[in-house]
Curated annotation (Swiss-Prot):
Any Pfam family the entry gives: Aminotran_5
Cofactor: pyridoxal 5'-phosphate
InterPro entries per record: Aminotrans_V_dom (IPR000192), Aminotrans_V_PyrdxlP_BS (IPR020578), Pser_aminoTfrase (IPR022278), PyrdxlP-dep_Trfase (IPR015424), PyrdxlP-dep_Trfase_major (IPR015421), PyrdxlP-dep_Trfase_small (IPR015422)
N6-(pyridoxal phosphate)lysine sites (modified residues): 198
Catalytic activity: O-phospho-L-serine + 2-oxoglutarate = 3-phosphooxypyruvate + L-glutamate; 4-(phosphooxy)-L-threonine + 2-oxoglutarate = (R)-3-hydroxy-2-oxo-4-phosphooxybutanoate + L-glutamate
Name of protein: Phosphoserine aminotransferase
Organism: Escherichia coli O6:H1 (strain CFT073 / ATCC 700928 / UPEC)
Pathway: Amino-acid biosynthesis; L-serine biosynthesis; L-serine from 3-phospho-D-glycerate: step 2/3; Cofactor biosynthesis; pyridoxine 5'-phosphate biosynthesis; pyridoxine 5'-phosphate from D-erythrose 4-phosphate: step 3/5
Subcellular location: Cytoplasm
Keyword Lipid metabolism: no
GO cellular component: cytoplasm
Length: 362
């Protein structure tokens, strides 16, 4: 079978080694003669899976001991509600920084539970889309927390700065599309959450990192399944968790550790992004409209100079084993999502195709 490279924004490509191991263990896991999908989440065998996954995740991100790690349901959209329901306390407002589609979606959900103070960080610089630096973000004095999204998958915009707003500002961040792709200082955040389906594992699992002093503040109307304290008190097993996604994510964590950890991913992700953006920037046939300082290393949107060629580009790239390159309906064009599991070889195959396509149709 020819090599297929999946550039989907999520659910996304998984490491081949992880899929091979899961395939081998699918019907007989740990010598039990059953699948990991069939064993009790409260049995000692799965408890070991859960504990190892949390330990490996903590090791990868150097999570401080005063932070809890929760394995949840609900995805990023679930956390759009969970954050205000858990962190507002007796306050009625929170700061939200709008830099793209997903930040705006979080704001829309937050309006059900509080009065968000919205700061529009989007700007245009020399005709390119960009984000105002954190030093210009206008925060309010009475906010319970400040929320932002470091990587906008649809817009292809990244905010790589580390928050430094003082110890009194609780920073909540949606790391769904950039978690584990580069080192982060967890201690600068109050809450970090991430849907699994991009850099962690299969869809269905959400990981939350929450500073322990923020527990116990949930709104009385907060559903129990979204209550961080209840999830923590029950070791993320208040109800039956997504066990297969948890298991497979644990395999991804071990794969990451075996391949140099987050620091190694950071380097190769930079190489992949530089290769792809390099082809775009050195061409009049392709274009990207994001300022270099805010370009995403995970999600690279680009347009063809002649949009009439879009359909042909997608057809020929798919035939060449380069799948899921169609851009989001909001922005159109193309988008290559190059998360941790995408090897440099895959990006090289894409750029070779792009150069050849331009030669034939430019």
């Amino acid at each position: 079978m020819a090599q297929i490279f999946n550039f989907s924004s999520g659910p996304a490509m998984l490491p081949a080694e992880v899929l091979k191991q899961a395939q081998q263990e699918l019907r007989d896991w740990n010598g039990l003669g059953t699948s990991v999908m069939e064993v009790s989440h409260r049995g000692k065998e799965f408890i070991q899976v859960a504990e190892e996954a949390e330990k490996d995740f903590r090791d990868l991100l150097n999570v401080p001991s005063n932070y809890k790690v929760l394995f949840c349901h609900g995805g990023g959209r679930g956390q759009f509600a969970a954050v205000p329901l858990n962190i507002l306390g007796d306050k009625t407002t929170a700061d939200y920084v709008d830099a793209g589609y997903w930040a705006a979606s979080a704001i829309k959900e937050a309006k059900k539970y509080c009065t968000p103070n919205v700061f529009d960080a989007k700007v245009t610089v020399d005709g390119l889309r960009a984000v105002k630096p954190m030093s210009e973000w206008q925060l309010s004095d009475n906010a319970a927390y400040m929320h932002y999204c470091p990587n906008e998958t649809i817009d292809g915009i990244a905010i790589d700065e580390t928050p430094d707003f003082g110890k009194d500002v609780v920073v909540a961040a949606d790391f769904s599309s950039t978690i584990l792709s580069r080192p982060i200082d967890v201690s600068r955040y109050g809450v970090i959450y991430a849907g699994a389906q991009k850099n962690i594992g299969p869809a269905g699992l959400t990981i939350v990192i929450v500073r322990e002093d923020l527990l116990g503040k949930a709104n009385i109307a907060c559903p129990s399944i979204l209550d961080y304290s209840i999830l923590n008190d029950n070791d993320s097993m208040f109800n039956t968790p997504p066990t297969f996604a948890w298991y497979l994510s644990g395999l991804v964590f071990k794969w990451l550790k075996a391949n140099g950890g987050v620091a190694a991913m950071d380097k190769i992700n930079q190489q992949k992004a530089e290769l792809l953006y390099g082809v775009i920037d050195n061409s009049d046939f392709y274009r990207n409209d994001v300022a270099k300082a805010n370009r995403s290393r995970m999600n690279v949107p680009f347009q063809l100079a002649d949009s009439a060629l879009d359909k042909l580009f997608l057809e020929e790239s798919f035939a060449a084993g380069l799948h899921a390159l169609k851009g989001h309906r909001v922005v159109g064009g193309m988008r290559a999502s190059i998360y941790n599991a995408m090897p440099l070889e895959g990006v090289k195959a894409l750029t070779d195709f792009m150069v050849e396509f331009e030669r034939r149709h430019g």
